[in-house]
């Protein structure tokens, strides 16, 4: 009977090890996904800042043109 208990325990340990290995793989995948999303976010932030600068430049040019029209 103790052999049966040892077999059951061994099976549960194997299942636990398999579960841990699967979870480790999932963690690695999630870390990679997180890194990719972080890079994408950083790229979008840079693009956003660039667009803000372009918008400011456009507004300044527009104000300048409107000022020239007012002077005419």
Swiss-Prot record:
Main location (coarse class): cytoplasm
InterPro entries the record matches: Cell_div_ZapB (IPR009252)
Annotated localization: Cytoplasm
UniProt entry keywords in alphabetical sequence: Cell cycle, Cell division, Coiled coil, Cytoplasm, Septation
Keyword Cell division: yes
Biological process (GO), any one: division septum assembly
One term under GO cellular component: cytoplasm
Keyword flag Cell division: yes
Top-rank lineage group of the source organism: Bacteria
Gene3D superfamilies in UniProt: 1.20.5.340
Coiled-coil boundaries: 3-71
Family, per entry: Belongs to the ZapB family.
Subunit text: Homodimer. The ends of the coiled-coil dimer bind to each other, forming polymers. Interacts with FtsZ.
Function: Non-essential, abundant cell division factor that is required for proper Z-ring formation. It is recruited early to the divisome by direct interaction with FtsZ, stimulating Z-ring assembly and thereby promoting cell division earlier in the cell cycle. Its recruitment to the Z-ring requires functional FtsA or ZipA.
Name assigned to this protein: Cell division protein ZapB
Protein species of origin: Haemophilus ducreyi (strain 35000HP / ATCC 700724)
Gene behind the chain: zapB
